[in-house]
């Protein structure tokens, strides 16, 4: 296969442009911090809160209990201090005016799910399934919901947040009831999630390596602190397992893809100007202005070495993947009803210096791709022309 024909596969397998930034990769919720950055820097705390809420489920609880591993993973951590995500998240919760969750007017799905354990993991799973109108029943051995997390903050504030996020949802709750017979539970429900906590019973379940949170028992899933991790990882598991349960209820399959771990980004602090971390004037929390000043330190980490080094890519202000799409349309005009001349100028402008390959961490040769594209144009009945650099702009 020629380099031209194989280039799409090369981009998919090697290009790091779409790799998550270090902070997002370290976050148990995979929070879209770059998306939040766009909202924070404009002072759009309502929009930021909605993104935060949709990702973590219980914003007030997470902002107070999360250890924020993203701060240590931040590119600036070893330079002048990582972005203060903890303070920014708490500022989001404090300054957002519209906090009510979305109310979904959906018909009942007619499927029943049992959740064994009323800690954060079980509550997170219940919230997501209730949002989609599944019938959920939570079994909790204690007389209150929340598990260990409830004791890590003011219980009144914890309960208030749970009530706020469930204000438009309904689920059954059996407090003070210990489940001892899992098979009896399976007979009454379409799916079961076991989230009994760090010291909880696992009912002898075996994990299934072919699906996230799946066990070898059909319809039974397991996660949360029972399988390791702190309360934030447990909550993230609960939110994610709801997708695995829904897949099972719809298809009968227990093969939900595993969440991608880590990032392939490789960036250095060379050339980054120092900007000391913003310290709250009151010593505790940011004002809106302080929050906007702090997020301005964000580097919006992404692999853009080729775009920074190549005059051609800077001229067209497009990512390698977008450029590939436009070149493909040009040399395969039948893919669109239009005349397919989108990238003729782009193809003809490159002088094939090879700089893009030199600076790319994966040594992807975009210039060779454009050269092969130019050679392919006559075969596709497209004329390629040479455009000198001084005429390219």
Question: What are these language model-derived features?
Answer:
Residues 167-188, 287-290:
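A structured beta-alpha segment of the ubiquitous adenosine-cofactor-binding alpha/beta core
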Residues 30-42, 47-50, 82-86, 115-178:
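Beta1-alpha1 glycine-rich phosphate/pyrophosphate-binding loop at the start
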Residues 149-151, 185-187, 371:
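Short secondary-structure transition/capping segments
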Residues 68, 145-146, 180-182, 326:
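Short secondary-structure capping/turn micro-motifs that flank functional sites
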Residues 1-107, 112, 164, 189-353, ...:
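Ferredoxin-type iron-sulfur electron-transfer modules and their immediate structural context
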Residues 135-143, 186, 190, 289:
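Solvent-exposed, well-ordered amphipathic alpha-helical segments
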